[in-house]
A protein has these predicted regions:
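A short beta-strand element within beta-rich, extracytoplasmic domains
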Residues: 48-58, 164-170
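Extracellular/luminal beta-rich ligand-recognition
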Residues: 71-120
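Extracellular/lumenal carbohydrate-interaction signature centered on repeated Trp-anchored short motifs
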Residues: 40-51, 126-129, 159
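Extracellular beta-strand elements of beta-rich domains used
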Residues: 166, 184-188
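Short, tryptophan-glycine- and acidic/Ser/Thr-enriched carbohydrate-recognition patches
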Residues: 1-11
Length: 191
């Protein structure tokens, strides 16, 4: 965790590496808080387009509208960023979330950042909590799908080839609730 940068927005979500189900995982506990942990990376999506991870959510944040600022809370989310700074208009991000109320595979713009940060509900309101889930996403294809096909493979590669950062966030500051999530191994692969 020493290579991760921590940014507290509201309160302090606690991130701790713990043993769980025979593996070492990251436990995130939010109590009316929002803290993001970020790691600069340089991932070539031409070589390794697939993001693989496992996660487990212990709490649903039911009754909130996650597509609004007042409901933008998630027990678990993983950001992938193209660009050096989310304040830069050219920077784009995908935010894979475990949604408490949106259908699985739905997509919407982040209510704070707008169109440059796209939310994708990898898990939705009907998914069972308190169970490990393994995920695999073709990040390169997701970037094309959410930010648009540039018209040719060459232009798509130029726009979407490299990732510059990954971030993890468990937050419940807007709803004032509590949430706990666990994150297993996160890695990129060719298939």
């Amino acid at each position: 965790m020493t290579s991760w940068q921590v940014k507290h927005f509201v309160g302090r979500t606690q991130y701790v590496v713990v043993p769980f189900d025979g593996q070492r995982v990251l436990r995130a506990t939010s109590n009316d808080s929002a803290t993001i942990i970020t790691k600069p990376i340089r991932i070539d999506l031409e070589e390794t387009p697939y993001l693989n991870w496992s996660w487990r959510v212990e709490d649903q944040l039911s009754g909130i509208n996650e597509t609004t600022k007042s409901g933008d809370d998630f027990a678990a989310r993983i950001y992938l960023v193209i660009g050096d700074n989310l304040l830069n208009p050219a920077t784009k991000a995908i935010n894979y979330v475990w949604s408490s109320n949106q259908p699985r595979y739905s997509r919407w713009s982040n209510p704070f950042a707008g169109e440059k940060v796209q939310m994708i509900a990898v898990r939705g309101a009907t998914d069972t909590i308190s169970q490990w889930r393994k995920e695999k996403r073709n990040v390169y294809q997701d970037l094309i799908n959410v930010f648009g096909d540039k018209g040719s493979e060459h232009k798509n590669r130029k726009a979407y080839r490299y990732l510059d950062a990954i971030a993890i966030m468990t937050d419940s500051d807007n709803s004032g609730r509590a949430a706990t999530a666990y994150y297993g191994d996160i890695f990129f692969s060719t298939k």
